[in-house]
Regions:
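Active-site-proximal, substrate-binding regions of enzyme catalytic domains
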Residues: 2-114, 121-218
Length: 218
């Protein structure tokens, strides 16, 4: 849900339409993500998130985001148990991953999908660089972090070959294919501004990474 929300809040939801048209990519979302992004915001008194929820619902109605209701409960239980018993602080396990991320990972594993779209830092680092996450947690919590090597190894086995794509990377791919070409001579400036907007919308990306992105594009 994090990447969908980032792109929607940054008024960049048409990245999904563009990439689907240009590449034939499929964007599959599990039911828990629909619940978090659409159903919950539409059925609470606070209407602050209603506009974003309706835009996401429109993408589902248009077939751009395709909902998947597969029985991945067994895989979810295993991923949640393993993922939340890797790191310990003061002798207690740190609960790091939740229903949305767990279901998405389980669905990707079940359907043999190589990439997941995710802006949330903790789960991404848990997949890509768990020891970097350990250092981050130690600095954030100001305590020593212990590692359950058995759970860590199991998580690496469960997510082997799984790639994580952030909303910023989806934007850069779309940019390289002409998504922003209608801006003519300010196209690159718009791309950079959009990356900063995605960062402020919730994508876990550093200023250094944005600079590196912009150096790598024409």
């Amino acid at each position: 849900s994090s990447a969908i929300i980032s792109l929607t809040d940054a008024c960049l939801a048409h990245v999904f339409y563009f990439l689907k048209e240009k590449t034939g990519a499929k964007f599959l979302v599990p039911k828990s993500v629909v619940q978090e992004c659409v159903e919950k915001p539409l059925h609470i008194p606070n209407k602050d998130y209603r506009f974003s929820a309706l835009k996401i619902k429109d993408m589902i109605n248009d077939g751009i985001l395709e909902t998947v209701d597969a029985d991945v409960s067994r895989r979810m239980a295993e991923l949640e148990k393993v993922g939340n018993t890797i790191f310990f602080a003061r002798g207690r396990p740190l609960r790091l991953i939740h229903a949305g991320e767990v279901e998405m990972m389980a669905l990707a594993e079940e359907l043999e999908i190589p990439n997941v779209l995710m802006d949330e830092r903790t789960t991404r680092l848990l997949i890509e660089a768990p020891l970097n996450l350990k250092e981050h947690l130690a600095k954030e919590l100001h305590v020593n972090i212990m590692v359950n090597n058995g759970s860590l190894q199991k998580m690496q086995e469960l997510t082997d070959g799984m790639g994580v794509i952030r909303s910023t990377e989806a934007l850069i791919v779309a940019y390289g294919m002409g998504f922003l070409k209608h801006f003519d001579e300010i196209e690159k400036d718009v791309a950079e501004a959009a990356l900063y907007r995605l960062k402020s919308a919730g994508c876990a990306i550093s200023f250094k990474e944005i600079d590196e992105y912009m150096k790598g594009v024409s």
